C-alpha cells in the first residue's frame, strides 16, 4: 500500500528517489516518487532512466510554472487517497559545506531555499524534508519560516541520521 507520494526537487540521477521507492513495510512498497524537478537536462535524463514512472521537469525551481505539477499531484492523491504528500528538497550545498572550507562560494544559490515556500503554499504537502549540510542552518531563521509557512500545522524537527545508503555519515 502506497503511504507516501514524493516530489523530489533537485532530483539528480535519482539516488534519493531510489531509496524512497525501496522503502518497504511487511514486504510492500510504501512510497512512490511521482514528480521530479532539476534544471540539468542530464540529471533529468538519468533520473528518468532510473524512474520512468515519475513526471519529470527540466526546469529551474525558481521559475517552474506549478500548474502541471499541481494537476499531477491531484491525480496522484485521487489514485492513492490514503497517501501523504512529501516535498523532498536536496538543495545545493557544495558551496557551503566545510568541505570547501566553510566559506560561501555562491551566495545566489542560498536563495533556492526561499523558493521552497512557493511549493509549500501551492502543494500543501503533508511533510517537508530538506537534506543539506549542517551549515545550512546558519543561513538565517529558516526553521521559524518553515513553521510559519505551514500555518501552524507543522513543526521543525531536525533528524540526525548516523548512516544512510553507502555508509555515508549524515546529520
Regions found by a protein language model. Give the residues of each.
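Conserved active-site and SAM-binding loop architecture
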Residues: 1-171
Amino acid at each position: 500500500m502506497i503511504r507516501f507520494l514524493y516530489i523530489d526537487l533537485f532530483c539528480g540521477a535519482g539516488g534519493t528517489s531510489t531509496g524512497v521507492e525501496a522503502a518497504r513495510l511487511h514486504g510492500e512498497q510504501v512510497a512512490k516518487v511521482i514528480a521530479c524537478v532539476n534544471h540539468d537536462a542530464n540529471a533529468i535524463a538519468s533520473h528518468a532512466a532510473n524512474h520512468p514512472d515519475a513526471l519529470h521537469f527540466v526546469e529551474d525551481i525558481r521559475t517552474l510554472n506549478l500548474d502541471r505539477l499541481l494537476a499531477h499531484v491531484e491525480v496522484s492523491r485521487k489514485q492513492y487517497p490514503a497517501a501523504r504528500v512529501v516535498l523532498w528538497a536536496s538543495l545545493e550545498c557544495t558551496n557551503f559545506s566545510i568541505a570547501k572550507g566553510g566559506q560561501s562560494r555562491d551566495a545566489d544559490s542560498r536563495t533556492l531555499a526561499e523558493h521552497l515556500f512557493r511549493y509549500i503554499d501551492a502543494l500543501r504537502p503533508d511533510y517537508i524534508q530538506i537534506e543539506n549540510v549542517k551549515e545550512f542552518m546558519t543561513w538565517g531563521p529558516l526553521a521559524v519560516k518553515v513553521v510559519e509557512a505551514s500555518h501552524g500545522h507543522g513543526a521543525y524537527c531536525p533528524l540526525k541520521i548516523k548512516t544512510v545508503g553507502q555508509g555515508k555519515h549524515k546529520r
